[in-house]
Each structure stands twice: as structure tokens, then as C-alpha cells.
Amino acid sequence: MRVAYSVIAGKKMNYKKGTLVCVGPGMVLGAHITERCKNHIKQADIVFTSCHPVIEKWLATLNSCTYSLQHLYADNKDRRNTYQQMQAAMLAEVRNNKKVVGAFYGHPGVFAQVPHHSIKQATEEGFEAWMEPGISADACLYADMGIDPGAYGCQQFEASQFMFYQRKLDPSAYVILWQLGHAGDLSLTPRLTGAPERQVLVDMLLEYYAPSHQVAIYESPFLPTQQPRIIWQRLDELPKADISLISTLVIPPGRRLIPNDEIVIRLKSIYPASHGKNTNKALGE
């Protein structure tokens, strides 16, 4: 068991017996899970899973007391109610002084409300709870598509959140819109939205990009034998694209980086003249 300290007071915490650890088995079956996460699953009293069905079956081979939370989803059911039920199921076992593991697709902290809320609630109730990282979809995307997010910068949004709120894009950076299959969904149900909602999204993106700008639909594989799905097409063709609930939209930069000359001049004034060549190299000059 971890020895944990209060972030505020720096004092050792006295925890109740039950524990909760949320882990991520990664994206690809058996290939991404860390030994640390695997050991947590093997040593748990009970494991709850919310992953691809194939991955859930494999996790059950590591611990026979494994239960899927997927049955809590239902057509026309508010996803927030489903998340509350998932959280309640795990916390009930923690309160029974069990070592509980929640295994969530990819990274348990990325596009997954239940692990964050469950850990917060467990901690507030005096139980030890924490998260172990896993390989997430963005890590796979960078590798599969050869993208370095540090080269031009990278903005990431959940597609519906981008649509519902006044967000600003930087078209000189990569833009990644997650959960494209739910884009524009106001019902908060598990349904797949369609061409009309995606047309609204495209209309918003056309404020920043040309209709012919090339964008990619990306899907990470689940099995080691599968290849990633990467489909390139024009931005204005997105409404009629073949989209699934695991589709992600990747938008490459649509314009060059614009130098901030005023700031560069200020920074150059800080350095001695002998460093001029190095400062020019840093700016790619």
C-alpha cells in the first residue's frame, strides 16, 4: 500500500482499509499494459472494466473476479447517469474494505470522467485511491501518423465541447478533435451523430481553413494484428465520411507560424552580441 501525504499539510494520512486504483490497459490488446497495472489487476479483490469487449475478456483472464460496466450504457439513457452508476458500483466495494481496481480503456484519466470522480470521492471518504497511467489514443496517434506535437504545437478539444462553447483555434498548429462520432450530440446518450451535426462542425472550421484543406480521420487498432485507420479527405467532405464512435479528427496546420517580431527583438536585446548566431538558429533563421 502507498504511503501518502496530505498535499496541503504535508502530513501522513490515515486511510481506511478499502482501496481504489484506476488503471489503463492501453489501446492494443495485451501490448500496452504495464507490469505495474497488470499486477494491480492480479492482486485486486474485484476488478471493474470499461473497455473494448475483447480487452475486457483478456483482463478477466488476469483476475476471475472481473465485472464489466458496459451493461450500464443503454440507448436514450443519459451518459451522466451511467457514469454515476459506474462510480457507485466501485465505491460500494471500496466501502466493503475491498482492494478495487477500475480498468478503463487507454489511459484512465483521458476522456474518462468516472475514474477522476471515483478517486476524488474515495479520497474524500478517507480511502486510499489513485491512478496509474496507460497508453492513450493520443500517444498512438502521434506514433501512427508521425506527428510531433512540439513541432508546431497541438490544440485538442472534445468535438462537442468545441461546438458548444466559444473556442478559438490556431490554424498554424495541429488541431485534434476527439469523439468525432458524438460531435454535436445534445442528448448525452451513446448515439452516433450524423451528417447534419458534422456539417455544423465543418461550417465552424471553415472560419479557419479552406474547404479543400486535407484532414484525417484516425482510429487506433484494438488488436496487434490490426492496422490504424487513417483516411485523408477534404474538410468539406467530412459530413459524408464514414465515422464511428472511436473516430478522431486530425487537422494539420493550415498556415505558417507568424513570428512575434516585437517579442523576439526584446529577447535578442537580453543576449550579448556574441550569442547572436545562436539566437538566430533558435528561430530557424
Regions found by a protein language model. Name each.
Residues 2-132, 247-248, 272-285:
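Class I S-adenosyl-L-methionine
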